[in-house]
Amino acid sequence: MSVQFTATALARAVTAGETTPQALLDQAVARAEAASTLNALVSLNEQAGAQAAEVSRRLAGGEALPLAGVPVIVKDNINVSGTRTTCGSRILATYVSPYTATAAQRLIDAGAVIVGKANMDEFAMGSSTESSASGPTLNPWDLSRVPGGSSGGSAVAVAANLTPVSLGSDTGGSVRQPAALTGVYGLKPTYGRVSRYGLVAYASSLDQIGPFARSAADLALLMNVVAGHDPRDATSLEAPARFQAGAPEDLKGLRVGVIRESLGGNTSAVDAALNTTLEALRAGGATTGEVSIPDLSHAIAAYYLIAMPEASSNLARYDGMVYGQRAPGSDVSEVMTLTREHGFGREVQRRIMIGTYALSSGYYDAYYSKAMKVRRLIAQEFSRAFQEYDVLVTPTSPFPAFRRGEKTSDPLAMYAADVDTVAVNLAGLPAISIPAGFDLAEGGVRLPVGVQFIAPALKDELLVQLAGALEGIGAVQLDSPAGYAAP
């Protein structure tokens, strides 16, 4: 019997006895191995078979499992007990986690089977998934192009139909931007909505775990599982919610504000996708208008002057003494120096150096402190915009997937890839990237583009509802790349 390749349909089929967790696991592993050229995964979970058997046992005992047997891939900075967590870095190449992140454990508790770990930019520092010690991940729409980052492996796993859903992390756009460049949904929840316990830290005041999916219903399903308070995460929020995909009638009366500062510098295909989405919203009964976030022009600078100092502090623990690889040396100082020199890649070293400089005596007020003031201003400007509009909209990325190597020698150009996404993290808001169209590149290659919707804090469920409503009126441009159709 053919089952639709969504988490919702697969869980229903397993519960009804139409297929088994082991059969779905075998299928996912076979598809991952067949698509190994994409380099979406860095490892398979050796415990997955035992997880599948446990799901079958629990179902036989009468348990109701919302993710019964659903194969899931998680980013390689989300700890799963007994598996390697490398964060895409040589320094953690042999590190095996002794515990499981709360988000991953909630997936397992709900009946999901974790197939493996997804490739990523080293320590989540990048926008292309090119800096991983395991090599770059390829975009299934065009193998010469990047999938975005830093959660490129998680995005590709869903775009190429290896699994119906996956988890990534978003510090400045690392779920939304690769979702846009690979043509799937990517949701960045409100800061604190999903526990960060067990997520390897990059910038602790910005990091947030979020899901990738191919349907609004699957986003709702995952968020109902992973969201919720966790006493082991001091930033976790007590904010119960019920996520549900919306219907076309939910668009009636919705007030949508287009952020004026996001309208310049986009490719024509990105502008066309945004305009088509706005037309669909108006046809569905929503109203649209423009709104200004004046300090958005300072968001990139403020973001990196906050993220890099936090990274320099968080990554100080990787010194060869406790975690990961250790380089030989004649004394402690030499061991630490060589361990970090050989263990960290070039981009990570760059960000640690800049972050340390920004925190140093005499420069703290000029850089980090000033960036924090800009952060507060941006948050206030978003709050004012939400007094007039229910949601805000921008392109997710000003351009579609770029070629591998195109921006690696120009860090500023790579940082600018996040121009439409970083402000959301600075303000701690929820945002979603929705597949909105395609750019036609040379040779007739279709490259996905995305549109980003932003909601007030703790209104994450509104974004999932909106995604479902747009699906219902045919405004979501979701497809599979050639050679990677759903099973």
UniProtKB/Swiss-Prot annotation:
Pfam family, one: Amidase
Known catalytic reactions: L-glutamyl-tRNA(Gln) + L-glutamine + ATP + H2O = L-glutaminyl-tRNA(Gln) + L-glutamate + ADP + phosphate + H(+)
Class in the EC hierarchy, top level: ligase
GO biological process, one term: translation
InterPro entries in the record: Amidase, Amidase_CS, Amidase_dom, AS_sf, GatA
Keyword presence, Ligase: yes
Domain of life from the UniProt record: Bacteria
One GO term describing the cellular component: glutamyl-tRNA(Gln) amidotransferase complex
Active site: K75 (charge relay system), S150 (charge relay system), S174 (acyl-ester intermediate)
Coiled-coil regions listed in the entry: none
EC number: 6.3.5.7
Alphabetized UniProt keyword annotations: ATP-binding, Ligase, Nucleotide-binding, Protein biosynthesis
Subunit-level organization: Heterotrimer of A, B and C subunits.
Family per similarity comment: Belongs to the amidase family. GatA subfamily.
PANTHER family per record: GLUTAMYL-TRNA(GLN) AMIDOTRANSFERASE SUBUNIT A, TRANSAMIDASE
Xref: HAMAP family: GatA
Entry function: Allows the formation of correctly charged Gln-tRNA(Gln) through the transamidation of misacylated Glu-tRNA(Gln) in organisms which lack glutaminyl-tRNA synthetase. The reaction takes place in the presence of glutamine and ATP through an activated gamma-phospho-Glu-tRNA(Gln).
Name of this protein: Glutamyl-tRNA(Gln) amidotransferase subunit A
Gene expressing this chain: gatA
